[in-house]
């Protein structure tokens, strides 16, 4: 993207987020800020900054929250507008370039921005790509359905850095924790000479914070496709906070009592036989 490397602030990792925080600290609160990307990260970033009093524009591309159902999208849009976020979406809202003080859209419009935040897409560490093992286009290790590298049975991957059968799961805490447990089970099975089990991963939805006092919970099928059902407002914020606390307490419990972690399971994925186990 022309100008993105020079003039936009990514927020994909801690160091990038620190750079952004420093830039915002030097910016007057009334100065315009643009957030590019309308996935959960972009939505949450726009909401947090607007709640602090920032003048925020969320540049969505074609649609706000592509994953969301219509009710979920309405819930998010309503809260963002309450916070004062200007939402730009539609066919002409793709970003064409980033300039020092503006975001240029595909239809020629310019969105004034003294700090442009780039939230479009996640990255992964380059360890797998540097290893010489096969990866997908963004560097996730290609594995079979037991999370074992298709090139080396001694290597197991989990979480955001794994691409089982070339069809990775959504980058999320909801996937990473169960994949970590299943990767451990794969290692234990191989140590004793057993055949590891294929991953079984179920999703329940997606939690989006909209500032400190509200949120949206998008309910999904177990295959991670959205249902036309959502929870909004303060209740959604409380649910997400409870989930975050439960995640931390679950990790602590697993450390005290190994094997105590449980997760919601679905049937085998359609890709389960796509890549043979090494």
Where in this protein do the model-derived segments appear?
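A conserved beta-strand/loop capping segment in the N-terminal third of enzymes
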Residues: 1-4
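FAD-site-proximal beta/loop scaffold in flavoenzymes
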Residues: 6-30, 110-178
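Rossmann-like NAD(P)H-binding beta-loop-alpha module
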Residues: 21-60, 64
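A conserved FAD-binding loop/helix module that cradles the flavin
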Residues: 129, 161-211
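C-terminal auxiliary extensions adjacent to catalytic cores
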Residues: 212-278
